[in-house]
Amino acid sequence: MFSPLSRIRGIVADTVAMVVYCFLTGMAIEIVLSDMSFQQSLSSRLLSIPVNIVIAWPYGLYRDRIVALALRLNADSRWGKNIADLFAYVSFQSPVYVAILLTIGAEPSQILKAVASNAVISMVMGVAYGYFLEYCRRLFRVSVSPRPQIVSH
């Protein structure tokens, strides 16, 4: 169904999208909303790069399945997809984010602020990331179905 080259392009597209998006949005949240220093945020973002490389493809698969399920249950594909993107992003990223912040030595209050802020902002970010991910997939010529099927890359 998918050629090996198509799978590789899909993995690379998902990885580029995850690394770029999480670096930029994470740094903004950590500095502006969570009272982290630039150094703490930079440490967090640099640590997040290898983590995001590892989780990007599994997240892409997870997100595609959540979106496909939501679209199957909801005839209004735009709202269903947006809600699915929000749910997938928050439910997958929050535990990973806590682990990163613990690793860099953030204070519990900073972690709580950062994760809570991220969850609230994810009401927009998760949806925006879904569109950014699909944009990256198009850049890498990965087929993007308007109604994703439950398949693995």
UniProtKB/Swiss-Prot annotation:
Keyword Transmembrane helix: yes
Positions of transmembrane segments: 11-31, 42-62, 86-106, 114-134
Molecular function terms, GO-annotated: L-amino acid efflux transmembrane transporter activity
Compartment list: Cell inner membrane
Biological-process GO terms, alphabetical: amino acid export across plasma membrane
InterPro entries: Ala_export_AlaE (IPR010574)
Entry membrane topology: Multi-pass membrane protein
Pfam family of the protein (one): AlaE
Top-rank taxon: Bacteria
Keywords: Amino-acid transport, Cell inner membrane, Cell membrane, Membrane, Transmembrane, Transmembrane helix, Transport
This protein's GO CC annotations: plasma membrane
Keyword Transmembrane helix included in the entry's annotation: yes
Predominant subcellular localization, coarse grouping: membrane
Role, per record: Exports L-alanine.
Family per record: Belongs to the AlaE exporter family.
Protein name: L-alanine exporter AlaE
Organism: Dickeya chrysanthemi (strain Ech1591)
